[in-house]
């Protein structure tokens, strides 16, 4: 892997890495890596990682070389002859651009390329390092266990500061080879980090088959295949939007196109823009024309005033005014069944066809018709050429989910019952509101279910609608058919609540806010009800005021997608901790004894967490399929679970999810690396660096015996599994035997002596000795090399099990005397030196590959003799004197110089030295050197 990266860095130009995989490895070990990116995305592949266009990074050459901080790589966008955009990697050495330090004794800080002065900005640097530390911990919470996850804000608004909303009006393309269409579509987009979700509704056109995003040159940036359905709503997501396209999106330079696959081959297109009305919009309309192939259309975004019955609206129109026309008078009408209710006159132009106005003081009849979707808004031009578009106003439609988590802690009289309520709503264009409700852990029978406003007085309920909820098996469903326009507006602004009153709690035992959950690209929400999460479902039950629900699904690749919404999780007394780490979500089997299949999903704060879990064991997939799995959220107050729910996800996964194939350079397939012990320090977030191996999860730093071969010992080191074969000590006897239940042979004489002396050793410990290093039992009298993680087996020591006491006695190995003048250590892990073999004259390249003797090593373009040592050279960096490589019978091994652990917080690295040192020690040495220099000058 590392030499493959060296080869890539040498070539400097990469679009994708091709080659062959390593030859069949001796052990089934693979470190977890990032998933391969879709082939449809433009970018660069570098060392198994995908980078978007115009991304910059420091290349990581792996152990023991690490990150090249003085080398900057850039994914440059290129265009082929056919106009297709692809990525090309270029790397340059930045060390030549370093400014000259202003001090006499500059230092090189870890992770930096340029030297800096140790004094001056120390205070600011310390603050920045603290900020980086907390930012890193914050970022860790945003990472899912295997792949990815993000957390929503705790704010009650559905959109946080990291999201941006856009809108597009799509009309028939008049300059296309396809016939112009009379269809109109409205698309709403939300950009969150690097993902763009979209909700599209359309009229007067058959369901499209393809959605395409077009860049400034008219080239396709992304395509979305529309799934078949019998409705007029399209939901989709564009993941990993490249940075150039994100800039074009922010600059309102991207277009969106939709085409049908039927015989008519219609196409609609429009520009994606930002608009100030999107934030407050609660009603909308699509305006179409009765003409055939008109290419005209419009959309209306409307909202009610918070206190008065004023209807604010903005019209966006296309094709109504001929190009190049000056001011054109239009009439904007509000109608009910062809009866004119209101009319506004205005002038618009082809360049600025947007129109904004307020319809003041709507009466009760107009508000009633508005709530039923029966009000029609129309725009008509005046003059010789009359053009007309119109559409009905209804509650704003999108792919977002109206939902609510009901908890006892959110009730007007807060409690801790451990109960839960989970509600999902659907608002129809005619104003009716469907609901589905699940409950668990109620203390008594349900008296009423109601939709309410926020209490105007303390503990004084403000009931709007009583829902006729009849519960069957703790489920209820129904419809509220007369939702007023004002309440529809409040519903879409997250201002309404749902309340469940019981016999013992007549004012309400469970309560929750009805919130719009933004669409995230998963269809589980649109097709399934969430799983309730409650304290009463934890084993043993927990009396808590918290509750939650979750959507869980398994895709065709056997990856588990989850989304969790919680309400009222308990917080610890330490506000600083509870503000950052709110909960831990995990998934497992209903049988608490089956801890091997419990998986941590993510740590999160706020009210929402979502992500993807890969590499699921067959056993856990089977439990998901049979409905015997659970999802649990734990907190600091309840570390063994505060809320839990039983999940049932039917799937047809008969084997673990396949790993992504990664291609390696075939030229470097014999390279082996020895890990640097100083980089294997204990990590406080062990779940982030844990390993998945043979269907089981292992925490960072743990060791175990693998199932495929009990004569190996495996350890987990920062998401990488390292398995070492058991090292057997050298026996001094001539005849050995191999016991079936042991990995190492023993002396046959020792076995016979044991049998004859069995009567004398009646008090011998029958179980043997337990050694903490390899966590194994060793038979009485056996010897072995100790296993010390993360270093592996130590050849310089031999341990013996004292059978009479059960104690382990370890002593250093005595090395034999050598006759040669220049002995060598064949392997850094070997305890004793050996005499090197006699040197042979160098061979030609052809002979090197065909020699029958000891294999030589090829590193880059150079060949090295067995036992030969050298410092590797890296392109753009030069010789790396802190790393030593050696040839071990045809296998190249490299190791960085081992550095002592430092106790200071701010270590520095000086030029010419491989190990960092404390700045205090450095300054002290500098002062002593200066004093010595002064004394020298005094003597002269």
Curated annotation (Swiss-Prot):
> What are the BP-aspect GO terms?
anterior/posterior axis specification; caudal fin morphogenesis; determination of heart left/right asymmetry; determination of left/right symmetry; determination of ventral identity; dorsal convergence; dorsal/ventral pattern formation; embryonic heart tube morphogenesis
Recite the UniProt keywords alphabetically.
Developmental protein, Glycoprotein, Repeat, Secreted, Signal
Annotated signal peptide: 1-19
SUBUNIT field: Interacts with twsg1 and/or bmp4.
- Sequence ranges assigned to domain VWFC in this UniProt record: 42-118, 689-748, 767-836, 855-919
Q: Where in the cell is it found?
A: Secreted
Q: What does this protein do?
A: Dorsalizing factor. Key developmental protein that dorsalizes early vertebrate embryonic tissues by binding to ventralizing TGF-beta family bone morphogenetic proteins (BMPs) and sequestering them in latent complexes.
Write down the glycosylated positions: 347, 430
One term of GO molecular function? BMP binding
Domain (CHRD): give its ranges. 162-277, 279-398, 404-519, 525-652
- Post-translational modification summary for this protein: Cleaved by tolloid proteases; cleavage participates in dorsoventral patterning during early development.
Can you name the source organism?
Danio rerio (Zebrafish)
Q: Which SUPFAM superfamilies match?
A: FnI-like domain
Any one Pfam family match given in the protein's UniProt record, by short name: CHRD
Q: What is this protein called?
A: Chordin
User: What does UniProt give as GO cellular component?
Assistant: extracellular space
Q: Which InterPro entries match?
A: Chordin (IPR016353), Chordin-like_regulators (IPR052278), CHRD (IPR010895), VWF_dom (IPR001007)
Its main localization is secreted
Protein family per UniProt? Belongs to the chordin family.
Which PANTHER family does this entry report, sorted A to Z?
A: CHORDIN
Q: Which domain of life is it from?
A: Eukaryota
